Amino acid sequence: MKKQNLIEMEGIVTESLPNAMFRVSLDNGCQVLAHISGKIRRNYIRILPGDKVKVELSPYDLTKGRITYRLRMKTTNG
């Protein structure tokens, strides 16, 4: 169930940290410490540095977030 007062932004994973934590660089230039949501963990979705992800931020602490979705990278055939 999605909460109403969350801020959702897109960013790129810059660093992988222990305990399923990641440093994410958001599109507006801010750095955020983010952990993986339960659905991503349960479905064994791998997140690597360089992946584009959606992050939910709490309005109370904008330095921490939760990775809710890994966006697909566009592949070019050529």
Curated annotation (Swiss-Prot):
It holds the Pfam family eIF-1a. It is found in: Plastid, Chloroplast. Its main location: plastid. GO terms for molecular function: ribosome binding; rRNA binding; translation initiation factor activity. One of its GO terms (cellular component) is chloroplast. It comes from the Eukaryota. Residues 1-72 form the S1-like domain. The keyword Protein biosynthesis applies. Keywords: Chloroplast, Initiation factor, Plastid, Protein biosynthesis, RNA-binding, rRNA-binding. PANTHER family: TRANSLATION INITIATION FACTOR IF-1, CHLOROPLASTIC (PTHR33370:SF1). One of the essential components for the initiation of protein synthesis. Stabilizes the binding of IF-2 and IF-3 on the 30S subunit to which N-formylmethionyl-tRNA(fMet) subsequently binds. Helps modulate mRNA selection, yielding the 30S pre-initiation complex (PIC). Upon addition of the 50S ribosomal subunit IF-1, IF-2 and IF-3 are released leaving the mature 70S translation initiation complex. Belongs to the IF-1 family. Component of the 30S ribosomal translation pre-initiation complex which assembles on the 30S ribosome in the order IF-2 and IF-3, IF-1 and N-formylmethionyl-tRNA(fMet); mRNA recruitment can occur at any time during PIC assembly. This is Translation initiation factor IF-1, chloroplastic. It comes from Chaetosphaeridium globosum. The gene is infA.
